[in-house]
Amino acid sequence: MTIKWVKSDPLVMNGEPFCYGSRLTVRQVLQARANGMTLVDMLKDHPELRVVGIAEAYAFAADNRDRYAEFFERNGSLAGPGYSAAEAARLPAQYRVPGIVVKAAKPAA
């Protein structure tokens, strides 16, 4: 069975896309990231979330940029801390997107 980590149901959370197995919307996950919450912080505060589920929420936002435009930096990356390279290494390849799921590389000085 394949799990769809981001779901949308008009009868749940007023139709706002949410993370499977939780009552957190994609918007709430993005707000937490923009406010500086790391992956470890999110999992500690919301143990019902899964590493791949959070990554899917970030990828969903990237695929729906118009809906979540306020969470994107000018360079196209999501605001706030992303996954470290070590954390992202455990994810399926389609989620290892620099600047979206994985922390954006710092520009060379």
Can you name each region flagged by the protein language model?
Residues 21:
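Anion-recognition interface
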Residues 3-18:
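Short, Lys/Arg-enriched N-terminal segment that forms or immediately precedes the first helix
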Residues 24-109:
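Long, charge-rich, low-complexity alpha-helical segments
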